[in-house]
Amino acid sequence: TFIKLLCRLYDPTKGHILLNGVDIREYEEAQYRKLFAVVFQDFKIFSFRFGENIAAGEKVDEERAMDAIRRVDLMRLYNKMPDGLNTMLNRDFSETGMEISGGEAQKTAMARAIYKDAPFVILDEPTAALDPIAESEIYSDFHRIVQDKTALFISHRLSACRFSKDI
C-alpha cells in the first residue's frame, strides 16, 4: 500500500504525502509517475520479445537495454537467446518462445526498472524468487545496479538490510 500511495496509484484518505514540501497531488500525474521505476512483488513478464519486456512500452534502445541486462546480471540468459533482444518470451504466441525461470523473470523486471532511468527506484521484495547465491549477488551489487538513483528496497528479510545505507 505504501508504494501505491507514493506512486499515486491510490490517494491517501487522511493526511498528505509531500515531495520537496509539495503535496504530490499538486504535481501533474503523468509527470509525477515518471519519477519512479517500481518493481512490484507481483510483477509481470509479458509474452513479448525480451527487449520489449525490458523497455516496457518504449521503443527498444539496444544500448540502454544491454546496460540494464548487464547491471542485473542477465548476460548468461541473453547469451542463450537465439535472437537476442528479439527473442520471444514464453510460448503463448510463438512456438519458439523461450521460457525463463522465476529468478530470470525477477531480474528481467529489475532490468525494466533500470531501463526506465527514473530518479527513484523502488524494489518490493526483489529477491524473493532468487536462489541464495543470486540474492547475495544482488545485495553485494545493489549500489552498482541502481547507481546514482535514490532507491527504496522493501524486504521482510533482515539480511537485506546489510547493504543499505539507511534503514
Describe the function of each predicted region:
Residues 18, 75-108, 117:
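ABC-fold ATPase nucleotide-binding domain signature/coupling loops
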Residues 15-22, 32:
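Conserved ABC transporter NBD signature motif
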Residues 144-155, 161:
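Conserved catalytic loops of ABC-family nucleotide-binding domains
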Residues 163-167:
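Conserved catalytic segment of ABC-fold P-loop ATPases
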Residues 132-134:
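Helix N-cap at the start of a conserved alpha-helix in ABC-type nucleotide-binding domains
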Residues 6-7:
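Helix-to-loop junction immediately C-terminal to a conserved catalytic motif
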Residues 121-125:
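Catalytic Walker B motif of ABC-type/P-loop ATPase nucleotide-binding domains
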